[in-house]
């Protein structure tokens, strides 16, 4: 009986809503606007920030495409169980910025370069497809859609070396993070660039936001005589809070870092470049490309190459995740003058520890632009054969480490065929000698033509390699005319896996 009475009493407390036809539905309980959680990453009506990381995986777990003639950089697929899925990236999202760099009007290759250069962590600013299309019409430009930090307002990566006064900071006492730093005037931390009152985000590449005070002290003690801190000053913390942007490590600028990448511009001599590229496991346990057997007096040695250097980029493009053969192809594609970015073992150890790419910390380094010409050295597995048709040829392609063949197709509704609109230097397509403007007649033995074939082409290209293409004669004049048409639709055989 007492239980029944309690139930009746509770029922009397239930609020009731009476519909008023003159006022319409004005029930506060049904107000969706008030119930929206502005910190919810699934709130698709505004730009979202996705901080992705490569832990055990080799990639972030999403595929990127761009339509020719449009400024859209579209997430066309998100792999299940990856960082991209866990952080809320969705199929159809438009990428507005990479690490605070607005990419709305950048070329597709530039966006891919930004993401790959970010290394094991990247911050993407994205917007849902339907919201992006409406907002672009209303705003007239993607730049107004993308919230960014002002110039000079960044988290800082500071390397602090202990002196007679210690590290020169104390930590605000609390049972658990977040923590803020109190600096000693003229101390080691202040000299290393730590701003006063900074929030402590990471110690030696590991987040301390959820550590207890005792755990943090133990971590600092284990650092020995030097420690690398990721911190955010008061202005940075305030700006990120206003934008809803995470205090992310890929946004950081380096202060007093113990190591940095080096750019080597090497011109081939009569005896070659004078070094050997070898694939082996690095300090992080992952395969990488390392430089050995640097011959004294030859161009590589004169440019400053040291045995044991790790190759980070070729012509400014990251080689992280590339296999040995593809890396060699990219170097050969440079011809007689190559631009390499390298790190020595000490720098490699440092950037592996902080889990950031050395390419984020290049200082006033001139990087030679990648050439447009493809290499003439063709590996055995990517070949071109004459075809029975006059003016046509047949080629067999194998996908690279990222799953792509290194080219993009374009079709126009009013056009009679498909043609190659872009070739990635160093990719299997470039190695096979294909060029922009080549028309595609057959794929894996099936004739193609026009935009009605895209669904079938997608199925064909998902089949087991090699990919067999029959190509017609090159038509650069027709290519230029087709690209200028607004009815043109771009289609990618294999999107970039990032």
Swiss-Prot record:
The modification Phosphoserine is found at residue 329. One of its GO terms (cellular component) is membrane. PROSITE patterns: PDZ. Its main location: membrane. The keyword Transit peptide does not apply. It comes from the Eukaryota. Residues 49-130, 157-235, 263-346, 394-475 form the PDZ domain. InterPro entries: NHER, PDZ, PDZ_6, PDZ_sf. It is found in: Cell membrane; Cytoplasm. Keywords: Cell membrane, Cytoplasm, Membrane, Phosphoprotein, Repeat. Induction: Isoform 2: Expressed in a circadian manner in the intestine. Disulfide bonds: none annotated. Pfam families: PDZ, PDZ_6. Expressed in kidney and small intestine. Not detected in heart, brain, spleen, lung, liver, skeletal muscle or testis. Transmembrane segments: none annotated. It is a peripheral membrane protein. Phosphorylation at Ser-329 negatively regulates its interaction with SLC26A3. One of its GO terms (molecular function) is guanylate cyclase inhibitor activity. PANTHER family: NA(+)_H(+) EXCHANGE REGULATORY COFACTOR NHE-RF4 (PTHR14191:SF20), PDZ DOMAIN CONTAINING PROTEIN (PTHR14191). Interacts with the C-terminal region of GUCY2C. Interacts with C-terminal region of SLC9A3 and the interactions decrease in response to elevated calcium ion levels. Interacts with the C-terminal region of SLC34A1. Interacts with USP2 isoform 2. Interacts (via the third PDZ domain) with SLC26A3 (via PDZ-binding motif). This interaction leads to decreased expression of SLC26A3 on the cell membrane resulting in its reduced exchanger activity. Acts as a regulatory protein that associates with GUCY2C and negatively modulates its heat-stable enterotoxin-mediated activation. Stimulates SLC9A3 activity in the presence of elevated calcium ions. This is Na(+)/H(+) exchange regulatory cofactor NHE-RF4. It comes from Mus musculus (Mouse).
């Amino acid at each position: 009986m007492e239980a029944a009475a309690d139930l009746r009493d509770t029922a009397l407390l239930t609020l009731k809503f009476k519909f008023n036809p003159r006022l319409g539905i004005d029930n506060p309980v049904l107000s969706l606007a008030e119930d929206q959680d502005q910190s919810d990453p699934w709130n698709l009506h505004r730009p979202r920030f996705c901080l992705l990381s490569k832990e055990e995986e080799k990639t972030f777990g999403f595929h990127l495409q761009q339509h020719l003639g449009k400024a859209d950089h579209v997430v066309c697929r998100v792999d299940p169980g990856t960082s991209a899925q866990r952080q809320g990236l969705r199929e159809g999202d438009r990428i507005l910025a990479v690490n605070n760099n607005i990419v709305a009007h950048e070329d597709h290759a530039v966006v891919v370069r930004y993401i790959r250069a970010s290394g094991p962590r990247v911050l993407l600013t994205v917007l849902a497809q339907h919201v992006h299309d409406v907002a672009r019409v209303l705003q007239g430009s993607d730049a107004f859609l993308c919230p960014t930090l002002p110039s000079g307002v960044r988290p800082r990566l500071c390397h602090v070396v202990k002196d007679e006064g210690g590290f020169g900071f104390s930590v605000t006492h609390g049972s658990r993070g977040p923590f803020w730093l109190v600096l000693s005037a003229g101390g080691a931390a202040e000299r290393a660039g730590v701003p006063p009152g900074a929030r402590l985000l990471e110690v030696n590449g590991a987040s301390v936001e959820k550590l207890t005070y005792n755990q943090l002290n133990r971590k600092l003690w284990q650092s020995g005589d030097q420690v690398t801190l990721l911190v955010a000053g008061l202005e940075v913390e305030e700006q990120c809070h206003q934008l809803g942007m995470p205090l992310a490590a890929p946004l950081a600028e380096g202060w007093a870092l113990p190591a940095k990448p080096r750019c080597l511009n090497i011109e081939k001599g009569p005896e070659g470049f004078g070094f050997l590229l070898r694939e082996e496991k690095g300090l992080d346990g992952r395969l990488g490309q390392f430089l050995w057997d640097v011959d004294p007096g030859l161009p590589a040695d004169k440019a400053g190459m040291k045995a044991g250097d790790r190759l980070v980029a070729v012509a400014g493009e990251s080689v992280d995740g590339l296999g040995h053969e593809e890396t060699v192809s990219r170097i050969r594609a440079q011809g007689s003058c190559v631009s390499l970015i390298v790190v020595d073992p000490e720098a490699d150890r440092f950037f592996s520890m902080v889990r950031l790419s050395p390419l984020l910390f290049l200082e006033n380094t001139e990087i030679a632009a990648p050439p447009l010409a493809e290499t003439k050295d063709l590996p055995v597995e990517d070949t071109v054969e004459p075809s029975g048709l006059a003016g046509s040829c047949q080629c067999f392609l194998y996908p690279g480490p990222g799953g792509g063949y290194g080219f993009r197709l374009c079709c126009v509704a009013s056009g009679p065929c498909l043609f190659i609109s872009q070739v990635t230097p160093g990719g299997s397509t470039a190695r096979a000698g294909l060029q922009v403007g080549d028309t595609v007649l057959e794929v894996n033995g099936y004739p193609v033509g026009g935009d009605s074939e895209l669904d079938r082409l997608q199925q064909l290209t998902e089949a087991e390699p090699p990919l067999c293409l029959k190509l017609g004669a090159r038509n650069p004049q027709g290519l230029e005319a087709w690209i200028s048409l607004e009815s043109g639709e771009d289609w990618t055989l294999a999107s970039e896996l990032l």
